[in-house]
């Protein structure tokens, strides 16, 4: 009796695994998306030089292109790498521009897709962001930003299938990006960029 139950359980697991594998093969393990993303920074910073609560640094909002490459290990689980080119950002102090910098923010996420293969497929993700900061031009060269930032990233989104390969996508991310502003005299301010990224795009599965 025990052998029969064990055999039945093994057969059931094999059938489920075969079904999941067949679905993945049918859709293909790779998904590439191109999105237009609006980046809206949180813009929280310490008062500059301790001069007062009103003297704060802000980073401008921006809409930018984004390339996302996902690999599905199973129909439900996927890893997504998010890429773009270095983005030029404006820095302001109490509304007056004081300089610019460029940032490159690749992000790696692990995703869970709730209804793979369905017409509407929502997902959530979590991972890590690495932001490389370069070409810093602040206060006529007298101030610098830290060259890199590592932080957490959270994601929620949904795919709307057009056919077996093409889909439309809506995606929202919250990313932790932080940096210190330094001068020769010491730290000028600590900035929490921590942006929301809201994107729409198209995906191709193969």
Regions from the language model: what does each represent?
Residues 36-40, 68-138, 195-205:
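Gram-negative (and chloroplast) outer-membrane scaffold detector with strong preference
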